Amino acid sequence: MTNIRKTHPLIKIINHSFIDLPAPSNISSWWNFGSLLGLCLMIQIITGLFLAMHYTSDTTTAFSSVAHICRDVNYGWLIRYMHANGASMFFICLFLHVGRGMYYGSYTFMETWNIGVILLFTVMATAFMGYVLPWGQMSFWGATVITNLLSAIPYIGTTLVEWIWGGFSVDKATLTRFFAFHFILPFIITALVIVHLLFLHETGSNNPTGLNSDADKIPFHPYYTIKDLLGALILILSLMTMVLFFPDLLGDPDNYTPANPLNTPPHIKPEWYFLFAYAILRSIPNKLGGVLALILSILILAFLPFLHTSKQRSMMFRPITQVLYWLLVANLLVLTWIGGQPVEHPFIIIGQLASISYFSIILILMPISGIIEDKLLKWSL
């Protein structure tokens, strides 16, 4: 009798994706983050669904409905904080996943990488709209400031902003449509994830050496299922520690004040995972220039395959590029710190220098270091 796992039209897809999938024998824990992102997405969809059952997307009751969830709904506080901190965990995993891809040259899988960049943009859009829903001060002003950036687009800017707002300011129409989009986008993300995996399984996974691993493959199950399970346990442990002991650690106290269009908070800033991009936006005095730099700070990832000059795929054996890579990581941490600081001396100049070095490292220094390393190895003949 043939195994149902290998014959059933639906089960065999799962079999080829998660059970009998040939995987490189040497992929490290940096390859765990894909499955952890899948877990994060599932947690967010489930907790989000239960939150949506009690939430009301009306300006007069949105803030109260979130308070009601936390006070009156059975385990509502748990669901709410799992959802809020789950987003932070999602972004931690995303940044590590992208960082892994950059370090080991996974961006040479063009289709997989480009879908990944689209996924990153989509998740960022979803997180931004989700932050608006509790209708606290930072929700309202964050929505006002970020949507207002579109007014920098020549000619159609102002019309576009008012069209997105559904009026002349961020109001009921804005909140309702943001709720609708925040609800639908995770399902679009899920569809994109399937496409992401589809393209990945066309080529197979990369590995730390960046070399072809066709000669040395092992089945995904049980080797990597058990490895992913360990990662999942660590993720859940970290998330629940955050939720149960430090639920407001990454949140903004201003969001416990109901939205008030007549009172601007002293420092408008987004959630921590957007601070690096926010710092780049603020470092350019021109509005349109800032918006373009903001978009480019993420879109630059799509250009990585074309900026790869080395004959080696991975950075594993490329010490000069490694130094630049870790400088870039440190630089992003500086940008994240600056994004949360007020616009005054010395933070302005630090932010501008960090923004310049961010783009310089990726666009100029890394491609040059790739060429230098090839010359040192006498590979550039």
Swiss-Prot record:
GO terms for cellular component: mitochondrial inner membrane; respiratory chain complex III. Its cofactor is heme b. InterPro entries: Cyt_b/b6_C (IPR005798), Cyt_b/b6_C_sf (IPR036150), Cyt_b/b6_N (IPR005797), Cytb/b6-like_sf (IPR027387), Cytochrome_b (IPR030689), Cytochrome_b_C_euk/bac (IPR048260), Cytochrome_b_N_euk/bac (IPR048259), Di-haem_cyt_TM (IPR016174). It holds the Pfam family Cytochrome_B. A ubiquinone binds at H201. Gene3D superfamilies: Cytochrome Bc1 Complex, Chain C. It is found in: Mitochondrion inner membrane. Heme b b562 binds at H83, H182. The chain crosses the membrane at residues 33-53, 77-98, 113-133, 178-198, 226-246, 288-308, 320-340, 347-367. Heme b b566 binds at H97, H196. Keywords: Electron transport, Heme, Iron, Membrane, Metal-binding, Mitochondrion, Mitochondrion inner membrane, Respiratory chain, Transmembrane, Transmembrane helix, Transport, Ubiquinone. Binds 2 heme b groups non-covalently. GO terms for biological process: mitochondrial electron transport, ubiquinol to cytochrome c. One of its GO terms (molecular function) is metal ion binding. Its main location: mitochondrion. It comes from the Eukaryota. It is a multi-pass membrane protein. Heme 1 (or BL or b562) is low-potential and absorbs at about 562 nm, and heme 2 (or BH or b566) is high-potential and absorbs at about 566 nm. The cytochrome bc1 complex contains 11 subunits: 3 respiratory subunits (MT-CYB, CYC1 and UQCRFS1), 2 core proteins (UQCRC1 and UQCRC2) and 6 low-molecular weight proteins (UQCRH/QCR6, UQCRB/QCR7, UQCRQ/QCR8, UQCR10/QCR9, UQCR11/QCR10 and a cleavage product of UQCRFS1). This cytochrome bc1 complex then forms a dimer. Component of the ubiquinol-cytochrome c reductase complex (complex III or cytochrome b-c1 complex) that is part of the mitochondrial respiratory chain. The b-c1 complex mediates electron transfer from ubiquinol to cytochrome c. Contributes to the generation of a proton gradient across the mitochondrial membrane that is then used for ATP synthesis. Belongs to the cytochrome b family. This is Cytochrome b. It comes from Chrotomys gonzalesi.
